[in-house]
Amino acid sequence: MRFDLEPPSSVAAAHRIGVLLINLGTPDAPTPRAVRRYLAEFLSDPRVVEIPQAIWQVLLRTVILPLRGRASAKKYAAVWMPEGSPLRVYTERQTEGVRHLLAANDYQVQVDYAMRYGSPNIAQALAQFKRAGVERVLLMPMYPQYSASTTATAFDAAFAALTRMRNQPEVRTVRHYADHPAYIHALAEQVRHYWAQHGRPDFAAGDKLVLSFHGVPKRTLDLGDPYHDQCQQTGALLMAALGLSTLECRVTFQSRFGKAEWLQPYTAPTLRELGEAGVRRADVFCPGFTADCLETIEEIGMEVRDEFLAGGGQAFHRIPCLNGASAWIGALGEIVAENLQGWPAKAAQPETVS
């Protein structure tokens, strides 16, 4: 096996620490070609689609990519920001926020981000850490709830990159933070901030808050994936923080792909049913998405909104994701700091003479 070329080892670099924030990924441009390239990588991951690859690749290349590439490109174009993809823009802002927060608290660490699919990829980010002399790495997925199709595959990619290194860094992973008090606080603050600006739903009159998480096939729950339970846990803690009951707030799952049964209840049908039942206002918040992206801006903000209004609803509100909110940056910094304990991450304090 050939190993990657590496700089000479340096004892002076032995205490350098890197924190890598990992998100899902995004096409490089809202064009059919770029979207097809991104989807080909994403949907070829056996952690994402658990179908024998010999069968799946034929279907993917001959049917799915040709059909979905152009349609998905139109959706990406509808949400694209002047600075680029929303997911990349917000992830970059989060990275910069955590970097500044840790530096302000005397942490001497390098903070960067990578995408599981697309660029910059995880192997590239780890190689950049290596060139900078980093010998300890904290992998921090931007997925609060653990799932094999998100968290595990991000770790897979990182460990695959390590197999090509002669001089591997020490590695720690953050498995999940679905119930972390700082994360729950940041979620509650995001909802409260939105309501302070746009008015609080009239729950006494029947208005609803819907917490929409990304869906996964139901069989993954039956096979032992903890994702569903952690989503429910996050939802319950957020409801408690907001002082809401299950009559006022409910958990749903979105982004179903294919014909197999996924985690239920599904978001879009739920919103249509609420509209048909006479619910006047529905607010939708996506706690599992730490940055706004196609699934939150287009799917929730446009498609799900239309379902609710078509059902008879009158007022639909999509509450933005955590993005660069100060409470979320603080929560990220707190979670990272907890997982850096035991490593020489902080600047040495000068001794005082009494």
From Swiss-Prot:
EC number(s) per entry: 4.98.1.1
Pfam family for this entry, one: Ferrochelatase
Main location: cytoplasm
One GO term describing the cellular component: cytoplasm
UniProt-annotated binding residues for Fe cation: H214, E295
Catalytic reactions on record: heme b + 2 H(+) = protoporphyrin IX + Fe(2+)
Subcellular location per the Swiss-Prot or TrEMBL entry: Cytoplasm
Enzyme class: lyase
Gene Ontology terms, MF aspect: ferrochelatase activity; metal ion binding
GO terms classed as biological process: heme biosynthetic process
Swiss-Prot/TrEMBL keywords: Cytoplasm, Heme biosynthesis, Iron, Lyase, Metal-binding, Porphyrin biosynthesis
Pathway info: Porphyrin-containing compound metabolism; protoheme biosynthesis; protoheme from protoporphyrin-IX: step 1/1
PANTHER family reported in the protein's UniProt record: FERROCHELATASE (PTHR11108), FERROCHELATASE, MITOCHONDRIAL (PTHR11108:SF1)
Family under the similarity heading: Belongs to the ferrochelatase family.
Function: Catalyzes the ferrous insertion into protoporphyrin IX.
Protein name: Ferrochelatase
Species, as recorded: Burkholderia vietnamiensis (strain G4 / LMG 22486) (Burkholderia cepacia (strain R1808))
Lineage of origin: Bacteria, Pseudomonadati, Pseudomonadota, Betaproteobacteria, Burkholderiales
